């Protein structure tokens, strides 16, 4: 879908493109985005996906505080929560679901 809609040397504004994409498709999207960036395209993306946030060299801006700030990938809540969940699934779910 993305490959057919995007063209070289354009500016793309995307709001949560991961919403309907599996993790595998998000990786495919990263490859398409990379190829287009190499052709001169630029992307401004609002996302919660740690996969899309991982794009090398991306400027990640956080709107969580009073001021907009650039943050490192590993400092994002999306990365930290996903990493913690994947590394500690059982204890995470036990704490979350404990009544």
Residue map of PLM features:
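GG-anchored amphipathic helix commonly corresponding to the ABC/SMC/Rad50 NBD signature/C-loop
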Residues: 1-14, 24-31, 35-36
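Short loop immediately C-terminal to the Walker-B catalytic DE motif
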Residues: 18-19
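C-terminal lobe/lid and adjacent interdomain/linker elements of RecA-like ASCE P-loop ATPase modules
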Residues: 24-44, 49-99
């Amino acid at each position: 879908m993305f490959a057919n809609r995007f063209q070289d040397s354009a500016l793309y504004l995307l709001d949560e493109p991961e919403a309907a994409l599996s993790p595998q498709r998000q990786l495919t999207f990263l490859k398409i985005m990379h190829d287009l960036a190499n052709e001169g395209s630029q992307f401004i993306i609002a996302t919660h996906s740690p996969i899309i946030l991982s794009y090398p060299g991306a400027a990640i801006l956080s709107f969580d505080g009073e001021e907009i700030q650039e943050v490192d990938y590993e400092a994002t809540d999306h990365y930290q929560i996903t990493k913690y969940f994947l590394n500690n699934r059982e204890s995470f779910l036990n704490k979350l679901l404990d009544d």
